[in-house]
Amino acid sequence: MIEIKLKNPEDFLKVKETLTRMGIANNKDKVLYQSCHILQKQGKYYIVHFKEMLRMDGRQVDIDGEDYQRRDSIAQLLEDWGLIVIEDSAREDLFGLTNNFRVISFKQKDDWTLKAKYTIGN
């Protein structure tokens, strides 16, 4: 989990929606699998890989460096876009950044099937 701050409280829904369009793409079938979610816990906000969410629910999952790297790269991109600020304490632990995910533009959203492998609250 990467602790973040929102620039404005209303940015929560923007970040949540944007994350639905970031992940692993199957270009042939035009399906995008969401990699990360925004989590609010005890008044703090986090960018969390879906496998971390499964693990918090007590499920056995294999999460590797590439998963963490993808999460960290997505968080960095959200920060570059001005949607979030990564907490300094979290910044120290970021994995090397990479471009191992796809971002679907808002305009392209209706052309793709967006799938989440985890649903918060279920």
UniProtKB/Swiss-Prot annotation:
* Stretch forming the signal peptide: none
Give me the gene this protein comes from.
regA
Going by the entry's taxonomy, the superkingdom of the source organism is recorded as Viruses
- Mutating residue 25 to V leads to what result? 100% activity loss
This molecule's function is given as:
Controls the translation of a number of proteins (such as regA itself, rIIB and at least 35 others) by binding to their mRNA.
Protein name, per record: Translation repressor protein
List the GO biological process terms.
Answer: regulation of translation
Q: Does the keyword Repressor apply?
A: yes
Could you tell me the keywords of this UniProt record?
DNA-binding, Repressor, Translation regulation
InterPro entries attached to this UniProt entry: Transl_repress_RegA, Transl_repress_RegA_sf
Task: Fetch the Pfam families from UniProt.
Answer: Translat_reg
According to the UniProt record, which residues make up the DNA-binding region?
15-37
Molecular functions per Gene Ontology: DNA binding; RNA binding
The answer to whether the entry has keyword Repressor is yes
Per its UniProt record, what Gene3D superfamilies does this chain match?
A: Translation repressor RegA
